[in-house]
Design a protein with these regions (language model features):
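Acidic/histidine-rich
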Residues: 172-253
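Hydrophobic, aromatic-enriched interface-forming segments
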Residues: 116-205
Length: 288
């Protein structure tokens, strides 16, 4: 999944001092996934005491990677993350070098869920302009000490924030792995689909797989799956990832159909059985 760039169990890492940023916090969290010990040195500039550190990240205004040292920053001439209009940050540059390039699907999901949002946030770019979800690490800056706190505790607090970020990142990674595991099952269900209505025997993360299958065409229009509240849900299919625009709307009149307990936002309808849900979904598609 991720590889060490420096073959050591214990490494010294320099990041910038002052305010906490998701960029440098995420860098440390990522390194802690592959190194047993990560010693963090927070400085306002690289000096003779720190210039030989194993990693120098988000500070220094230079990129230089050797087998003994990794220096990555983004405050020099801006660079774009490949295939996007999002500017690089130190975390995106570090991830780019550490992630397994052959695990294409995992990389795609990780970039969409974590890397691109963190980079956009750090560079002051608007998430919505790029169809991105907000950064899952937006809490980082809010965790800094107040002016009345003992500033000697700043590094200790930084470590606490890194641990919080690690919990988030580990959960994102697990969610992605579980999502990838579901792809084959969703694909098999798509093969059996009839009339634009996809029926899942159990809830699975289906959105990405269905959007990819549709490829800009309304092949799958509605998805039915068991609800964790009992019964079955009908849900509309978004036209593209991160969009509320769908191929069709669920009309209010669906609430009058047999077995329906209600609908929400023209995007969901709730039924007591899969049979009633399928019957309703086919009617919705036919009448659209």
């Amino acid at each position: 999944m991720f590889k060490k760039l420096i073959n050591k169990n214990e490494v010294n890492v320099v990041v910038h001092g002052g305010c906490f940023h998701a960029d440098d916090v995420a860098c440390i969290a990522l390194l802690k996934l592959v190194h047993n010990e990560v010693n963090v040195i927070r400085k306002f500039k690289v000096d003779v005491d720190t210039e030989t550190a194993d990693y120098i990240l988000d500070i220094g205004r230079v990129d230089k990677v050797t087998e003994n040292q990794v220096i990555l920053d983004h405050h020099q001439t801006p660079e774009l993350i490949e295939g996007t209009e999002v500017k690089h940050c130190a975390f995106s540059k570090l991830t780019e070098r550490m992630i397994d390039p052959d695990n294409v699907l995992f990389k795609k999901h990780l970039y969409n869920a974590l890397v691109l949002p963190v980079a956009a946030q750090d560079n002051g770019q608007n998430y919505s302009e790029f169809g991105l979800v907000p950064s899952p690490l937006t809490f980082v800056n809010a965790m800094g000490l107040s002016w009345k706190d003992d500033q000697k505790l700043n590094d200790q607090r930084f470590g606490e924030v890194v641990n919080m970020a690690m919990m988030v990142i580990k959960n994102i990674i697990k969610t992605i792995e579980d999502k990838i595991e579901a792809v084959d099952e969703v694909t098999a269900a798509i093969r059996k689909m009839e009339g634009g209505v996809l029926v899942l025997d159990r809830y699975l993360p289906w959105v990405d797989s269905v959007i990819e299958y549709n490829n800009g065409e309304p092949k799958v229009k509605l998805v039915i799956y068991p609800s964790n509240r009992g019964g079955f849900n009908i849900q509309v299919v978004p036209i593209k990832g991160g969009s509320f625009e769908s191929w069709l709307k669920i009309p209010e009149e669906v609430a009058n159909l047999e077995g329906c307990s209600g609908q929400a936002h023209s995007a969901f309808a709730f039924f007591d059985s899969v049979e009633h849900a399928v019957e309703a979904a086919r009617k919705i598609v036919k009448d659209a």
